[in-house]
Structures are given as structure tokens and as C-alpha cells.
Amino acid sequence: AMLEQLHVDVLDLGIVRDDPAALEAALRDAVARDADAVITSGGVSVGEADFTRDVMARLGEVTFASLALRPGRPLAVGTLARGDGAPGHALFFGLPGNPVASAVTFDAIVRAALLTLAGACVPPPAMYTAYTTQALKKRAGRTEYLRGIATRAADGRWHVAPAGSQSSASLSGLAAANCFIVLGHDAAAVDAGAPVDILPFGSPI
């Protein structure tokens, strides 16, 4: 659905089992079909069944494999060679398997890359200032995207509260939210009533 909002042509190659050979075959198939970008979900962490980064390294180049981002730390970004001596390459984005982490990394990284690839002029994130109605826990050293519900008060100021569960595996909070609460890399815990940045859903990145 997030890809369709960008009006790109989507080629769904289905579900690939946790097997290096099957994954390699699927990625080779994708680039053979002249895909400009290949996006996968899951298999990018360091578990026994996580093969994406190794296969990606064999078929192309891994630019980076993790981010100081929550949710969304495991993320593989790089390129896949066309193979058989064909020129050029396809961009590759290996997103986390947890659905919320996948949505966050798509919004934070993939959306802008695909729009740029399509030749669009990509504006900076449309951030707004809101005042949190609750204290927010945060550890400095990583950027955090909390799912939030923003409302506008009579005085014109935005107020925001966390939307349900903030687990990266829980879709309920994401479904209830209308924005991300973006807490910067160096920020620590936030007191109730403090200003924070929010990124409304549907804002261009």
C-alpha cells in the first residue's frame, strides 16, 4: 500500500522461505526483470535464519546494515548487480520483519530514495511542533519514531499522545495513529507538556 501511494509499478514476487538458495534465486529473478529497486521484509538481523545480508553481499554491495533507529535498527541497504555482464544495478532495501519497523524504515529511508530515483524533487520532512500530553521514555543515541495521535487545540497548537502499544510487532498502535512522534538522536526522556516533532502520515519525505 505504501508503494502504491507513490504510483510506482509493483512486482510482487511472493513469500520466500528462510533458505539462502531460495532467497538468492528470488533476488536474481527480481533484477532479471529489470526492477529499478528490490525491497524485502525480514531476514536482515543476525539470527540463524537471517540470510539477507550475506546473499546481498554475494550479489552486489551492502552500503550499510543497521541504523541507530527505533524501531528499525536492522536494515540492509545497497545494490544488486544485474548479472551476466549486464550494465547497471538495482537498489536494494532489506527492511525489518516486524511490521511497524518495516513501515518506519520505509517512511524514513525508502520513500525518499524511490522518489529521487523517479526524478522527483523530494522536499524535507514536513515536521510540525506538538506538545506531548504524556512523558515519553527515550534513550539518547538513537532516533525514535513513536506512533502518535495528534489533535489541534482551540489556541491552534498541536498536542500529541502515544497511540497504544509501541511494540514494533504491534499493528494496533500504528492503526490508531495519525502521525509519528520523532525524537532525535541526541534527545533523552521527554517531560509531559514539552514540545516534540511530529510527522503526520501522508507527509512527503
Where are these regions (language model features)?
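Active-site-adjacent beta-strand anchor residues
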Residues: 13-16, 42, 95, 183
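Flexible glycine/proline-rich
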Residues: 55-205
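Phosphate-binding glycine-rich loops and their immediate beta-loop-alpha structural context
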Residues: 1-40
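Short catalytic-site patches enriched in acidic/histidine residues
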Residues: 16-28, 46-67, 74
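Glycine-rich beta-strand-to-loop/alpha-helix junction loops that act as flexible
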Residues: 9, 35, 40-52, 62, ...
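Glycine-/small-residue-rich active-site loops that bind phosphorylated ligands and cofactors
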Residues: 15-18, 44-47, 101-102, 188
